């Protein structure tokens, strides 16, 4: 069964791309009777507040017609930011050599929260170097992954 996030990605990719943006990813946070739908968009030129507003109007219209969410929800549209979330194998691949943190569904090496360097991505398998040790993590075991911003 497809997750709500995957259904939303399928539903919203074309409308977001029609506006000239990349649909970076979607987070669906279920909080009781109210939920949050976070839509992350990106562009080579960067993302501005007007881009978020335009995308929000378009996404809202699609969600109103398709009605995929049965609870009340708040729609948030933003850029991925400097600590960008990672959703796909291609996104992890693009950040090989960068520091990242991941929250896991099932523990790896006794932990559900890991910080390390993305060292390899093969298919749907991520290798994260944590304290000098390579840990193998299935991407479908990652609940949430983010780049750790360096300043």
UniProtKB/Swiss-Prot annotation:
Gene3D superfamilies: Ribosome maturation factor RimP, C-terminal domain, RimP-like superfamily, N-terminal. The keyword Cytoplasm applies. GO terms for cellular component: cytosol. Keywords: Cytoplasm, Ribosome biogenesis. One of its GO terms (biological process) is ribosomal small subunit assembly. It is found in: Cytoplasm. It comes from the Bacteria. NCBIfam families: PRK00092.1-1. PANTHER family: RIBOSOME MATURATION FACTOR RIMP. Required for maturation of 30S ribosomal subunits. Belongs to the RimP family. This is Ribosome maturation factor RimP. The gene is rimP.
């Amino acid at each position: 069964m497809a997750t709500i996030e995957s259904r939303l990605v399928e539903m919203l990719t074309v409308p977001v791309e029609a506006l000239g943006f990349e649909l970076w990813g979607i987070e669906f946070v279920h909080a009781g009777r109210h939920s949050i739908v976070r839509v992350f968009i990106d562009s080579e030129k960067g993302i501005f507040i007007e881009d978020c507003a335009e995308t929000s109007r378009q996404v809202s219209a699609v969600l109103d017609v398709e009605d995929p969410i049965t609870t009340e929800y708040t729609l948030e549209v933003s850029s991925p930011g400097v600590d960008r979330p990672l959703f796909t194998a291609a996104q992890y691949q693009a950040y090989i050599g960068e520091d990242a943190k991941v929250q896991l569904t099932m523990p790896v090496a006794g932990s559900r929260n890991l910080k390390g360097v993305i060292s390899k991505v093969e298919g749907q398998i991520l290798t994260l170097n944590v304290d000098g040790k390579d840990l193998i993590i299935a991407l479908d075991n990652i609940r949430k992954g983010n780049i750790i911003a360096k300043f």
